[in-house]
């Protein structure tokens, strides 16, 4: 079709699936450049490494896994005299994530726009253990420019919402967007795909309603079932053979 690999985004849910797709395409084409074949989070890392200046973060920000988060929590516990009897690190991670996503819509604007000094002040003023952890987490994050997995999506969406030039750049770059396992997509991932295909309007999705496995973390099967009602002029193909 005359489209370069770098103008195609193919998103799946696991690094293993993405690696398998890259291997298959390389075997078919012999081309080392297989385009953007990645998970949602990996794609967001790519966006942020290119455009993190829009949120005053360095290109070499840290991607935090659970062990990194636990190390940050340990600092907060020690600084504020908290104990694991009150709340384990695992429970603290869950509490913070729940409040970030459900109860504190101002969390991300604050993390992005407030100074380190202001975040520190909010942390030191907190008294209840939950509030200490919830205010100490963004302060500790910003000190090391660290982002956890959910932050990657939120920061990317924030940049696209706030900066029309950056949004248009990525929309124009990605001529074709393909999403695997669409039955497991959640609200943030769906919004990201809507934004990215807002220029070329070429969106291809693959899904099986009976195979959804991520409803426990926010996946909404309605995005697949209602696809032909939301997207103008779609074409639906039934895949009857397993490849």
Model regions and ranges:
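ATPase/helicase motor core of nucleic-acid motors
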Residues: 43, 78, 229-231
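Residue-level signature of catalytic and energy-coupling elements of molecular machines
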Residues: 14, 39, 73, 148, ...
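Conserved helicase NTPase motor core
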Residues: 9, 36, 65-68, 123-226, ...
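Class I S-adenosyl-L-methionine
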Residues: 19-22, 26, 74, 138, ...
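Short amphipathic alpha-helical segments
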Residues: 22-24, 49, 74, 190-191, ...
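P-loop NTPase Walker
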Residues: 1-57, 63, 144, 168, ...
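ATP-hydrolysis module of ASCE/P-loop NTPase motor domains
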Residues: 32-35, 53-150, 236-242
């Amino acid at each position: 079709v005359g489209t370069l690999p770098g103008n195609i985004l193919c998103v799946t849910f696991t690094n293993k699936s993405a690696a398998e797709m890259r291997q298959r395409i390389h075997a078919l084409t012999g081309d080392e450049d297989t385009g953007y074949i990645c998970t949602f989070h990996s794609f967001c890392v790519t966006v942020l490494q290119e455009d993190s200046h829009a949120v005053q973060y360095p290109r070499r920000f840290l991607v935090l896994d659970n062990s990194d988060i636990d190390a940050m929590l340990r600092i907060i516990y020690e600084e504020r005299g908290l104990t694991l009897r009150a709340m384990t690190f695992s429970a603290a991670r869950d509490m913070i994530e729940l409040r970030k996503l459900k109860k504190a819509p101002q969390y991300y604007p604050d993390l992005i726009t407030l100074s380190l000094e202001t975040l520190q002040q909010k942390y030191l003023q907190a008294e209840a253990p939950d509030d200490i952890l919830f205010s100490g987490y963004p302060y500790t994050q910003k000190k090391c420019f660290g982002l956890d997995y959910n932050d990657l999506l939120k920061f990317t969406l924030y940049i696209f919402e706030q900066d029309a030039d950056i949004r248009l750049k990525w929309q124009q770059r990605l001529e074709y967007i393909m999403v695997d396992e669409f039955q497991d997509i959640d609200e943030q991932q769906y919004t990201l795909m809507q934004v990215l295909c807002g220029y070329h309007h070429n969106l291809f999705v693959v899904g099986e309603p009976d195979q959804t496995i991520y409803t426990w973390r926010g996946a909404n099967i309605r995005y697949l079932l209602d696809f032909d009602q939301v997207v103008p002029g779609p074409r639906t193909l039934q895949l009857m053979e397993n490849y």
